[in-house]
Amino acid sequence: MELFGHTKDVIRANYFYLMERMCPSKISDAHDIPIIINNYNRLTMLKKLIDSLTSRGYTNIVILDNQSTYPPLLEWYAKCEFEVIRLPKNYGFKALWKYAPVRKRFCSDYYIYTDPDVQLSPECPADVIERMFHILKC
């Protein structure tokens, strides 16, 4: 089994190497990577996540809304400085892949996909996304 696990890692590394050569990323800076937040009726956690991201300098934030009905959230969306994409129905956690317009827009390059209840730990390095981006680009 150890050999198979290693083989998967080699295949994965070769896949990313070849993809970068055949379809090079248009993204040259980690701060340009879109951070897509899948949301449904969550305001408090969404604001905390966005505050955490913006405090680290990330502003390319897109919110996928799964037909939320919570009035305070809808009011906040109206004033929100980030792009909010109101989906035609609730696609659940797979919204990015199930709704073709957003899949086509974001899935051809680097992106980060999360829910609002995933929070960055205070111990998390401020440059964690830059570190991951550097590893992917190597």
Residue spans for each PLM region:
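Acidic donor-binding segment of Leloir-type glycosyltransferases
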Residues: 52-89
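Active-site nucleotide-sugar/metal-binding loop of Leloir-type enzymes
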Residues: 94-110
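Short acidic, S/G/P-rich loop/turn micro-motifs used as interaction or catalytic elements
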Residues: 42-43, 117-121, 135
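N-proximal low-complexity "stem/linker" segments adjacent to membrane-targeting elements
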Residues: 2-51
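Preference for well-ordered, secondary-structure-rich cores of eukaryotic proteins
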Residues: 38-39, 66-67, 119-120
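Conserved donor-nucleotide/metal-binding helix-loop-beta segment in metal-dependent transferases, i.e.
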Residues: 124-138
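Structural beta-sheet core signal
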Residues: 35-37, 63, 113
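Short beta-strand-to-loop acidic/aromatic patch adjacent to the donor-nucleotide binding site
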Residues: 107-121
